[in-house]
Regions:
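Conserved ABC transporter NBD signature motif
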Residues: 60-69, 80, 114-118
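ABC-type ATPase nucleotide-binding domains, specifically the catalytic core motifs of the NBD
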Residues: 16, 72, 97-116, 124-129, ...
Length: 239
């Protein structure tokens, strides 16, 4: 522990002519959970797209465990141990649960912690195991989210990016998802959690970064934000 799992430094990103990220920097420590907060359109999901290579930055650098990955294709960044649970789940709805998981399988890197495979995913999410032969599109929203998380874990990542994992879920299912995140963190996985619900993030985060209009406007240990209510209200409209 103690090294940096993921570092974004001075990232500028554009959608066409629209400048959407302005010198964004964030640092995820190994085995830690970084909460990335901001209002709609603040740049949270864009930061995740840049990290996994879906949107190449025009300026700045990205490193995974000290290895530069700036400008690499998504496959190359995934090979370094980065996996994304995307907003909206984006499972393969015409495939079975098992097929969704199998297509994402990747051998774990040397020195990894948990070795994720079908049996360990089914142990983590028993309902997914019970429905392994079921077409994924017929699952409930909560089950689809579990499948999306399981699919990301099948790549045996060292860094897991989770973009709005509670979106559209009932409170009981949100509690299950958060319990899963705690378990993964407890196993030493390095996690970036993007959430619309800041109170969920503060339940599990070690560190916080707040974006506003594509810029980092606040950052620090999560515990420090307990006394920064005015700042949270200004940037997030809460507390």
């Amino acid at each position: 522990m103690g090294s940096d799992a993921l570092v974004l430094h001075d990232i500028d990103a554009f959608y066409g002519d629209s400048h959407v990220l302005h010198r964004v920097s964030l640092r995820l420590g190994e085995g830690r959970l970084l909460g990335l907060l901001g209002r709609n359109g603040a740049g949270k999901s864009t930061s995740m797209s840049v990290t996994v290579g879906l949107l190449p930055p025009r300026h700045g650098t990205i490193a995974v465990f000290g290895q530069a990955v700036t400008g690499r294709a998504p496959e190359g960044i995934a090979a370094q141990g980065v996996a994304l649970v995307p907003q909206g789940r984006r499972i393969f709805k015409s495939l079975t649960v098992r097929e969704n998981l199998a297509v994402a399988g990747r051998k774990p890197r040397t020195g990894g912690s948990t070795r994720w495979a079908l049996d360990t995913i089914y142990e983590l999410f028993p309902r997914i195991g019970e429905r392994r032969r079921q077409i994924a599109g017929s699952l409930s929203g909560g089950e689809q989210q579990m499948l999306a998380i399981g699919r990301a874990l099948m790549s045996n990542p060292r860094v897991l990016l989770m973009d709005e994992p509670s979106e559209g879920l009932a409170p009981l299912i949100v509690a299950e998802v958060m319990a899963t995140i705690r378990r993964l963190k407890g196993q030493g996985l390095s996690i970036v959690l993007v959430e619309q619900n800041p109170k969920l993030v503060f339940q599990v985060a070690d560190d916080i970064v707040i974006l506003n209009s594509g810029r980092v406007v606040a950052e620090g240990p999560a515990a420090e934000f307990r006394d920064r209510d005015a700042e949270l209200h200004q940037h997030l409209g809460i507390f």
